[in-house]
Amino acid sequence: MTNRAWLLLLSAALSACAQKSAEEGAEPAPATVAAAAETAPTAQDGANGVAIWVHPQDGARSLILGAGGTGGLEVYGLDGALRQRIDDIEASHVTVRYGFDLGGRRIPLVLVFDPMRSQLFPYTIGDDGRLSRLSGTPVQADDDLVGLCSYTSPVSGRVYALGMTDGGQMLQWEYFTKGDAVEARLVRSVPVGKGAEYCVVDDASGTLYYGDEALGVMALPASVETDPARTVVDLAAPRGGLAAEVKGVGFVHGADGRPLVVVTDASAERFAIYGPEGGPIGRFQIGAGGAVDAVGESEGLAVAAVPMGEAYPEGILVVADQDNDGEHSNFKIVGWREARVAAGIADTAFAD
């Protein structure tokens, strides 16, 4: 699709959303849910991107992988306690792929972006729950990545990393093995405009969802064989249902199989959930509860709707909290059941 065609479509969408907003008027305040736990503060006050690794046998032993800026990658248990810190790199974004084929072994592949080096480093998670770096050449990005997600093609089984650059490009790398080393090659670059940041992919449909700080939430095909035509999920105010700054984006499948996209509506200090038809189907905010403070300024988020022990029978939502009451920022852990109930969403089921 040409830039002119895209702009014409976007203009039409903006006009339609503006008319809808004017007709609907002011919306009620979203329901509040309290975080069940919080992680230890980040070492260098850099809570940013976050990912969840689901333990294959025991969901209660799952891990939270938090990008802690200059403090490196910080690994937490579901109780929020720090289990491991990888501090020989800086970390701004992290993503996890399950079942990556390394010499005939299926392993979790963890990709971490180091903004100081502008490189993507590969790690895996051992049976003991510890992360270790894999051999191979780190990906050298041409620009700072302000968003990172990953995708496994349901057709070819190939694994990809997708990075949103500060310069307004979506870079897509295919990951593969050469002996015991993990390597990658750039397979495409798609202009998405400055402002595109956090992202997530629905593997089943091959749809990349990303937040654009100024525009709203957008989608485009993640498949390298498909024309990267963008579509609008929702727009920022005053033409859509989002505030002026969109940050983290997460994804789960509903119990009926429909995709649900969870978005950090940062300027409004709230979170929105979208269904396949577009437009928000639920909203909530994260308030104080017990010894855990409310979430204020937030950026990255991750969600996994799979049982994770008695405390989290439907999984968890994890969000970065730059306004943590402690000295440094941290990550808040919310039961997914509590979050979706607050948002008025029916039961959801994990699908990867």
Q: Which sequence ranges carry the predicted segments?
A:
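Positively charged n-region of N-terminal signal peptides that target proteins for export
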Residues: M1-A5
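Bacterial N-terminal signal peptides
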Residues: W6-S15
